[in-house]
Amino acid sequence: MRYGVKLFVGIVLSTMLTSMGVLAQDITVIKAGSLFDSRSGDVTRDVLIVIEDDRIVAVMDGDEEIPDEAEVIDLSDSFVLPGVMDMHTHVVGNLANNFFAGYFQSPHRATIGGVVNAEKTLMAGFTTIRNVGAGDYMDVALRNAINDGEVPGPRMAVSGPSLGITGGHCDRNSLNSSFEERSDGVADGPWAVREKIRTNVKYGVDLTKFCATGGVFSKGTKVGMTQYTLEEMEAIVDESHTHGRKVAAHAHGNEGIKRAIIAGVDSIEHASFLDEEAVRMGMERGTFFAMDIYNTEYTLERGAENGVPEENINKEREVGTRQRQSFTLAVEMGAKVVFATDSGVYPHGDNGKQFARAVRFGMTPVQAIQSATSLTAELLGWEDQVGAIEEGLYADIIAVHGDPLDDISELEDVDFVMKGGVVYKSK
């Protein structure tokens, strides 16, 4: 929202600084050379963004007078946009460097690694993420530490342990039966999944993630094979929504995708083997598609040296090309496709590399940025908090020196990061 009258400055700034007793350092003004409107896709030149504490209080024409008391951040030579968001991360995991690390690290050690990964993600310009799958509620602990200001990192919506069937993608299947290995989220049957969701809610999760099909990085599961019955999926969705939690369904295979959409999930993760009917079903029900179209390149190039078994590399080969075709189909049909990368499969902090792939496989640069800002905010239900540079929203702001609408790869290395009014990076 823009304001072009001098009176507004007097009301918003001077009143805040004097009548309300606000300290001068609480007011920051960003001078933006170009400002991207994530809702309309328009770009406006020479804009002032006024910030009080952690919120944006005004967006004004650049010729308005700035009070002497305000701190000024000069980004007049930069392209300014909302902090971007990634809807599929594993910030407490790091398959990219060591496929078997999870078998040798304690949850405590993995959570400490998550602190490092969270900071890398924030410094890449990702001010909000969804973490979809973490045992022992490691992601809950990390989210809380970030929210309490103890460590730097993005805003996090977290799922805790992912639900899955016995022996499915969300179970642990690599060791023999004498180890009696079982993932935290394994639950079979409609009442068992309800109990698991209630437990997750008890320990503070923001959403539910479950595995509706097999996957790439699990042993012994076919990528497209459907897991969970419709009855079980409907129980997962009903129980989650009863508790005000949205539902993300890991689903590669088309039948599992359709079953999850019918059950009422909020997002389909991966969505590798889509057909037109599945896309239409999702569009009719308002389902989001969260499709990771960069990580295949990393896995095929570096997976073997990082210990990824040949079985899993072969499954990645099976999925990669087809998933990108599905991405193009969903974009062309007008589905809600959000930015989601599966970080942890590739190195944390490289999330921005997916923007160029999104454009290569069908999005315009504007669509690619919106998929990581206004559209992701809609999926989270946080439209009144993040996803745009507007009055009342968190001051989550990034900037680059080039124009990402001309060269989307500019977003692979951002120059400025602010989250909640605090500057974390400024080149």
Tell where the protein language model's regions lie, with residue ranges.
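Active-site gating loops and adjacent loop-to-helix segments of metal-dependent hydrolytic enzymes
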Residues: 93-110, 166-181, 216-230, 285-320
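Alpha-helix-loop-beta-strand connector modules within alpha/beta enzyme cores
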Residues: 144, 148-162, 224-249, 286, ...
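Divalent metal-dependent hydrolysis catalytic cores, especially in the metallo-beta-lactamase
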Residues: 114-139, 153-162, 205-218, 246, ...
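Bacterial N-terminal signal peptides
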Residues: 6-19
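His/Asp/Glu-enriched, well-ordered alpha-helical/loop segment
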Residues: 242-246, 310-311, 317-404
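Histidine-rich, glycine-flanked metal-binding segment
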Residues: 35, 40-81
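Histidine/acidic-residue-rich catalytic or RNA/ligand-binding cores of hydrolases
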Residues: 95-99, 218-220, 257-263, 293-308, ...
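Metal-associated gating/positioning segment near the N- to mid-region
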Residues: 79-150, 165-169, 173-176, 231, ...
